[in-house]
From Swiss-Prot:
The lineage of its organism: Bacteria, Bacillati, Bacillota, Bacilli, Bacillales. This is Phage-like element PBSX protein XkdE. Belongs to the phage portal family. PBSX subfamily. NCBIfam families: portal_PBSX. InterPro entries: PBSX_Firmicutes, Phage/GTA_portal, Phage_portal_PBSX. It comes from the Bacteria.
Length: 495
């Protein structure tokens, strides 16, 4: 008795799957050692990975825009309008204000300082690291900044401790102390040419060509300083989304699979079973050619003709052959494949995970379908409070700590502005009882009126406008004025 055998033949397209032609080669690979430290991840790949994601770049743009997009501003480090403030200190603070305002406006002549800082923040969010070069003027004071592309930068080991001066304020007086600090070096390499930078604040002279510290050196060979903005406390920063890198690549593969589906047209996977017969050689070749020519919508609707040959039995008494009847069945395998809903669910979960790594609501990435005004305002305020305000504060504190002491500016500081969520109409309603009680002076309301009118209003110099209504003989009907202001705002909103 002969055993029955089953032969399986798989038909598939001969076309190779598309493969990336990019090479994430590290030009520093042969230079890593005791001096130049290797990063934990491939910097070039991290720099370009946002091009393969449908959500990562939106999250990075949200950070860059909301941290630096509202611009720099200057604020006093003390209450300049307090009655006990010394006039000499007040004048000194006003001069510092003008100097600092001119400083940040002239940090870069081609682009704004916010734009250069934004480039570094974008690098930091992509790779965990961002760099800026600091330029000094002839007097040795910081005078400008330049963007340093992170993919060309590497960090070197820390050197021996160096004695540096540190200026701080105590009881209203500036004091200076000496302390020991270890500085790092940074190296940039483009097309095989290396350029060294020293960490900002390093008082030593460094050769830009070799990275060696020297006592005397021509000015053109002296290395400039660099500021390293990083996420984390390591030698290199680590991007906040690095734990989701598998989801990022998985979502990309799902998108590529869908693209190939639409590119090649609708071709249902199927099993063709032939019973009591064999597929003819011609049918076999036709099936293989059909699979090879899958690509293109013009091949999406074709008729398939299958020819099978029955198996001949033994000859009968008259010499003829009895051919067994052939049964051909096509069984669809589409139902065992993952459906489109699973891909959509995977993509949505991947987007949510990446967005969660940045702690951003969908509103900040252009996905606001389920928001109304109340929920949108709540999402904006919570994100501003929990994410962007701390980021601005951390960043600007670093800049103030590094730059202002060398500029001899101590009474004012840089700030990064944020959005203004205040509604003048709501503020006017709240101020009503205070105005009626005589607790607000006209000058206290000039800033509010300026925001309503869209221009800056200076305070009135007369003393009468510096005191609340009702404390002077010449009373003004401030409550009526506020009522008119509220009505004007309502008319503007309804018009």
């Amino acid at each position: 008795m002969h055993n029955q055998t089953v032969r399986a033949t798989v038909f598939k397209a001969n076309a190779a799957a598309p493969q990336t032609k990019q090479i994430y080669e590290d030009d520093f690979s042969e230079l890593y050692g005791e001096d130049i430290i290797a990063p934990p991840y491939n910097i070039i790949e991290l720099k370009t990975i946002a091009e393969y994601s449908t959500i990562l770049q939106q999250c990075i743009d949200a950070y860059r825009v909301n941290i630096t997009g509202f611009g720099f501003d200057v604020e006093y480090t003390f209450d300049v309008n307090a009655s006990d403030v010394d006039q000499a200190k007040k004048k000194r603070a006003e001069k510092d204000w003008a100097r600092l305002e001119a400083f940040y406006k002239c940090l870069h002549f081609d682009e704004s300082a916010e734009m250069i800082l934004g480039y570094a923040i974008e690098d930091r969010e992509k790779t965990g690291n961002g760099f800026m070069e600091v330029l000094r003027d002839g007097a040795g004071k910081p005078a400008g900044i330049e963007y340093l592309d992170v993919k060309y930068m590497r960090v070197c080991g820390a050197g021996e401790p160096v004695e540096v001066s540190f200026v701080y304020e105590e009881n209203g007086k500036m004091k200076r102390i000496k302390r020991q600090k270890r500085f790092r070096k940074y190296v940039q390499m483009i097309n095989g040419k290396k350029v060294f930078f020293k960490e900002y604040g390093d008082p030593r002279k460094m050769d830009i060509r070799t990275g060696e510290y020297v006592n005397t050196l021509a000015e053109k060979y002296q290395a400039n300083e660099a500021i390293h903005l990083k996420i984390g406390s390591g030698v290199y920063g680590v991007p906040r989304w690095i734990g989701n890198i598998v989801n990022l690549y998985g979502a990309r593969k799902a998108e590529e699979l869908n693209f190939m589906y639409f590119k090649q047209g609708r071709h249902v996977p199927a099993a063709i079973t032939v019973e009591n017969g064999m597929l003819s050689e011609a049918s076999y070749r036709e099936l293989q050619e059909y699979m090879n020519d899958l690509e293109g919508v013009e091949n999406a609707h074709k008729f398939l003709l299958i020819e099978a040959e029955g198996i001949a039995k033994e000859k009968d008494l008259h010499g003829g052959e009895d051919i067994t009847p052939v049964s051909v069945e096509i069984k669809s395998l589409a139902e065992i494949l993952q459906n489109d809903a699973l891909f959509l669910e995977y993509d949505e979960k991947s987007r949510n995970k990446l967005r969660s790594a940045f702690r951003l609501p969908p509103l900040y990435t252009g996905e606001a379908q389920e928001y109304n005004r109340a929920t949108a305002d709540t999402a904006r305020k919570i994100t501003e409070e929990q994410v962007f305000q701390p980021e601005r504060k951390t960043l600007v504190n670093k800049l103030n700590t590094l730059l202002l002491p060398e500029l001899n500016i101590h009474d004012v500081r840089l700030t990064l502005k944020g959005p203004d969520f205040r509604d003048p109409l709501e503020i006017a309603k709240v101020l009503g009882p205070f105005i009626t009680a005589g607790a607000v002076s006209p000058n206290d309301l000039r800033d509010l009126a300026g925001r309503v009118l869209g221009k800056t209003l200076e305070e009135w110099p007369e003393d009468i406008y510096k005191r609340p209504a009702g404390q002077d003989a010449e009373k003004t009907n401030l409550a009526a004025l506020m009522q008119e202001l509220k009505e004007s705002i309502e008319d503007i909103k309804t018009s």
